[in-house]
Amino acid sequence: MIIPWQDIAPDTLENLISEFVLREGTDYGEVEISHQEKVDQIKVLLKNGEAMVVFSELHETVDIQTKARFNPNLTNHNYD
């Protein structure tokens, strides 16, 4: 289930993004960027609709997914 990022308290969203950035690894490319810059980049992706906050009912977890990686079959469990 997609959770609108605008509905999440600012501090909670900041912590969620920060945790996501830490989990995603350390691909610095040619120029190393700060943790806060990475957080800011994710905020831009959320605002542009290129990333989304997703709640997995099956796993009872919240995550940030890029639009390209989002698979709705992994977030919902259909009992039909």
Curated annotation (Swiss-Prot):
<dbReference type="InterPro" id="IPR010648">
    <property type="entry name" value="UPF0270"/>
</dbReference>
<protein>
    <recommendedName>
        <fullName>UPF0270 protein VFMJ11_0205</fullName>
    </recommendedName>
</protein>
<comment type="similarity">
    <text>Belongs to the UPF0270 family.</text>
</comment>
<dbReference type="Pfam" id="PF06794">
    <property type="entry name" value="UPF0270"/>
</dbReference>
<dbReference type="InterPro" id="IPR036685">
    <property type="entry name" value="YehU-like_sf"/>
</dbReference>
